[in-house]
Each structure stands twice: as C-alpha cells, then as structure tokens.
Amino acid sequence: EPSRRQRQMCIRDSYYTTLFQQANTFSLGYNMNYDFIGQLRDYGVGFFGQYPFSKFSRFDFGATIRNVDYEIRQFDIFSFETSTNYKENLRAVVPLTSFVFDNSTNGYTGPVDGFKQYLTFQFSPDIGSNSIPFQTLKFDMRKYYKINRNYSLAARLMLGKSVGDKPQKFFLGGNSQMMIFSDTQTEGRDDSGFYAQRVLDYDNTSILEDVYFSEYVFPLRGARYRERVGENVAVANFEFRFPFVNYVDVSFPARIRFGNIFGHLFVDVGAAWDSSEEFDNSELVRNKYGLSDPKASPILTTFGIGTKIFTPFALIRIDTAWDKYPSGGYSKPQYIISFGYDW
C-alpha cells in the first residue's frame, strides 16, 4: 500500500494532452496584375506533465509534434483565377524539460514577495529534410522584495542561448500584449509600428522559423518587437511598484468614483546577438539593422514610469518610456498601452 507521501504526490502530479490547428491568411501586397496572399497553418499534438518535488518546486516536461505550412498564392485581378507560386513545410518534434522553483506571494497586480526560477531545455532533433534541428537553454529568475503592504521592489534576469543546424532566434523588444504603441524614435528619427522588422513579408525567406520556432523576449518597454534579434539573449528588468491613486470621489458635475490605480518605475536593459563580435564591432550591428550610429550596439536600455488600472475586462497598463542612445541622449517619450499582470 502506498505511503501517505506517495498518495499526496500522485494527487498532485498532473498530465494533459492538447490537439491544435491554427490557420492565418494575410495580404502580401499587390501589383498591376495580381494580389499576393500568404497562408500559414500550424497543426499537431502536445503531451505535457508536472512532477512536484515540494510545495515550491516541480519538474515540468513534455513534447510537441507539429507541422507548419506556408503558401503564397497569387490572385489574377482580371481572370479571377488563383494559383500557388510558393510552398514550404517544416516538421518538428520538440521535447522540453523545465525545473521550476516558486515561493512568491501575489498582491493585487502580481507578485510582491519571494523568488521565482525557471531553467528550461528544449530541442528539436533532425528528423529529415524538412526538420529544424536546434537545442535551446533558457534561465529566468525573479526576485521580489516587499517593503510594506503597498510598496515592493522587483528584479529579473533572463538568459537564453540556442545552437544547432537551425538555431532558434530570440526577438527582443516590446511588451506583452501591446494594444497601442505611439510613434517611436530610432537614433533620433521618428518611426512607427509595433515591429522594427516585419515578419509577414513577401521577401522573408525564414517566415516559418520566425513565426513558429522563435521566441519573443520582453519586457523592453520603449523598444519595438524585434528591435534586436539573435541566437543569444540577455535581459534584466528592475521595477519599483507603488500605489498611485487610492480613491477619488467626485460629486460635480457628475458623481464619479474610481481608485486602486497602481504605479511603477522601471528600467529595462537587454541584448540579443548572433556573434560576440557584435559587441566590439559596431559595423556588424549597423549592417544587421540598417543603423547609422557609429556606436550602434546589440544592447538596448529603456526606462520610464507607468500605471495599472483595473477594468471589468482586464488590468490595463499605461507606460511612458524613453530609449537611451548609444552615443548619448534620449528619445522622446513613447506611450504604450497593454494589458496583463506584473511579471
């Protein structure tokens, strides 16, 4: 008969399976004769489990078997005929293991005290000509220090490295679940858009790898998605979290009550790179991203202030961020609206 400890562990173990199929159709532009349409499809099955060692630590494991397809179709605007002019397919089996330690405690908007740590290894073996062989190791640790009931400090360090015949890419920049990102600046020049480099582009020859086998790394508020790209990544985040508006009651001209608005000061520093030479040779960085700053670097530094507001739908985050330029100086303020809890 199993012991009490064994019975508890059996109850707490968890396993699950998922089947998935997603398709996305999008425009790739047009010319005088044709509309070009891209279609992506991702389908497969995943098996996952968790084995706890204690109340605060566990071992996560699993594997995903997936197929991804990409097809470019051209639509003749005169004959109304559609034909396929490009097809691509990738197949992958991706096992993963992760050791997790988490003794953090949560407040209204996320963790306020304790420690979190994730050490994850995943790989994709060579299973044929359409496979994408890689091995990726990621380490993520987060420390929270509760000053008192309402004030706390948070620090995070994330490191990642991928190797293999077709290593994964890390896309550095942005914030989770951004809804609005105001016009930004790169080297003092105004730019716009969520992405520094477009993914869904007709000329992108690695679209399947970019969409399905790359990882977005954030937050790096004040930078766009894919502001830096590489097989290696390092990010450090620091926040001071505090109450901003506890309660407001306005009687005239209308009765308005609101409160529980929280604030935070933040500094985000990160880098993504393919070769360590990028840190010493700015020409490599300029050529890689189309920059002109003689001190261009894979390192990005941003800082700012933000608020968090509870709504009936989600926790809305409003951030104001500034970039620090490698040659000195700072960008104009950039305004970001996103939703989600604190990391």
Give the role of each language-model region:
Residues E1-R7, I11:
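Single conserved hydrophobic/aromatic residue that forms the stacking wall/gate
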Residues Q6, D42-G44, A92-L96, G114, ...:
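Transmembrane beta-barrel architecture of outer-membrane proteins
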Residues D13, M32-Q74, T82-T84:
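Transmembrane beta-barrel wall of Gram-negative outer-membrane proteins
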Residues T17-T25, N31-D35, S83-E88, A92-N260, ...:
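C-terminal outer-membrane beta-barrel translocator/porin domains of Gram-negative envelope proteins
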Residues R58-D60, S152-A154, L315-R317:
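Membrane-spanning beta-strand positions in outer-membrane beta-barrel proteins
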Residues L96-F99, I309, K332-W343:
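Outer-membrane beta-barrel "beta-signal"
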Residues N148, I309-F313:
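A generic beta-sheet turn/junction motif
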Residues D268:
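Short basic (Lys/Arg) and small-residue
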